A protein has these predicted regions:
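A short, conserved alpha-helix in the catalytic core of glycosyltransferases
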Residues: 153-156, 160-165, 171-199
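Cell-envelope/extracellular polymer assembly enzymes that use nucleotide-activated donors
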Residues: 3-6, 36, 180
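Catalytic core of nucleotide-sugar-dependent glycosyltransferases
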Residues: 200, 210-238, 288-303
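N-proximal low-complexity "stem/linker" segments adjacent to membrane-targeting elements
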Residues: 1-27
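Short aromatic/hydrophobic "clamp" motif used to bind/position activated sugar donors
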Residues: 90
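Glycine-rich, basic loop-to-helix element that forms the pyrophosphate-binding segment
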Residues: 68-85
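Conserved donor NDP-sugar-binding/catalytic core segment of glycosyltransferases
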Residues: 98-133
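A conserved acidic beta->alpha catalytic loop
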Residues: 24, 41-50, 70, 94-97
Length: 313
């Protein structure tokens, strides 16, 4: 049987959740001979190689693995997988996401029903449990993104990706590469179709000093690629996406209680909100601190660039 579908999953230092991600992908209702999973390890330093070896031996479907010895970045990892793919339909799944058994079938059906080039997208739902991810009592729709293309849960034909030019590897190590590719896909006239039955579950571990520190570091890295993204697309749409307007800065200040909430006490405030029966307020406060870290990173890069230009003069 010919492989129809290639699942593209880049990963870095997510060994525990990666094992569950691959277990879920190997348990799809789609015939195991009809799809493959390609995992590209972006220079992990944890137990990822051992997890990949065990998953490859245990899975019903074919799992192919590649390793980037140095941290080449997520755009480069996805591009490597796309070039190596044998399936014409590419489905993007992140390594901290878990797919219900009907997930791939829903994506395949979406494309079979359309004769045109399309992007199929589905909901991304938060789950707090790795043991019973699809029944987690804290689950709720997380991704309300209206971006044209997002790699959290999307599928399209490999030939279309090649025509659009793949992901921009200069957006290293990650950040904005999906939006950037989305602009090119939109220019090609590609339609989007939203399938509610193609949901995927995104694992969010409980907030802790370790996970919060990792989230802050992620925002700092995202900020590093923002100037390059804006340089490529200096539009008002991108200005809004990057939260670079005075209104966004004011809104963030309000969200952080005019500086009362900061990285040093955000977790304590989130715990208070949980005790008061308002966990949503806690998440809102934490999100404000994370956004402030991103905005500070972008502002620092911009100031550094202005200083360099003055020195050059």
């Amino acid at each position: 049987m010919t492989i129809e579908v290639t699942v593209v999953t880049p990963t870095r230092n997510r060994a525990a959740v990666l094992a569950e991600c691959l277990r879920a992908l190997a348990a799809q209702s789609l015939a195991p001979e009809a799809y493959e999973v390609i995992v590209v390890d972006d220079g992990s330093t944890d137990e990822t190689p051992a997890v990949l070896d065990a998953a490859t031996r245990a899975a019903r479907c074919e799992i192919r693995t590649f390793r980037q010895p140095a941290r080449a970045g997520i755009p480069a990892a996805r591009n490597l997988a796309i070039r190596e793919a044998r399936g014409e339909l590419i489905v993007f799944v992140d390594s901290d996401e878990l797919a219900p058994p009907h997930f791939l079938t829903a994506h395949v059906d979406c494309h079979r029903r359309s004769r045109a080039d399309i992007i199929c997208r589905g909901p991304v739902v938060t789950t707090r449990s790795l043991e019973r991810p699809f029944e987690s009592p804290g689950a709720g729709v997380m991704d309300l993104s209206i971006s044209y293309f997002d790699t959290d849960n999307a599928s399209l034909r490999r030939s279309l990706l090649l025509r659009a030019g793949l992901f921009d590897e200069s957006l290293h190590p990650f950040g904005w590469e999906g939006l950037d590719l989305g602009f090119r896909l939109r220019a090609l006239g590609v339609r989007r179709i939203y399938r509610r039955d193609a949901a995927i579950y995104h694992f969010r571990p409980p907030l802790s000093p370790e996970t919060f520190s990792a989230m802050l570091a992620k925002e700092e890295e995202r900020a590093k690629t923002a100037p390059r993204f804006y340089e490529k697309h200096p539009t008002f749409e991108v200005t809004l996406a990057l939260s670079l307007t005075p209104f966004h800065r004011w809104l963030n200040l309000v969200q952080r209680g005019f500086g009362l909430i900061h990285a040093g006490n955000a977790l304590a405030w989130a715990e208070r909100a949980e005790r008061w029966g308002a966990p949503g307020i806690g998440r809102l406060l934490v999100a404000g601190v994370l956004n402030e870290r991103f905005l500070a990173g972008v502002r620092g890069l911009r100031d550094h660039g202005n200083q360099r230009r003055r020195l050059d003069v």
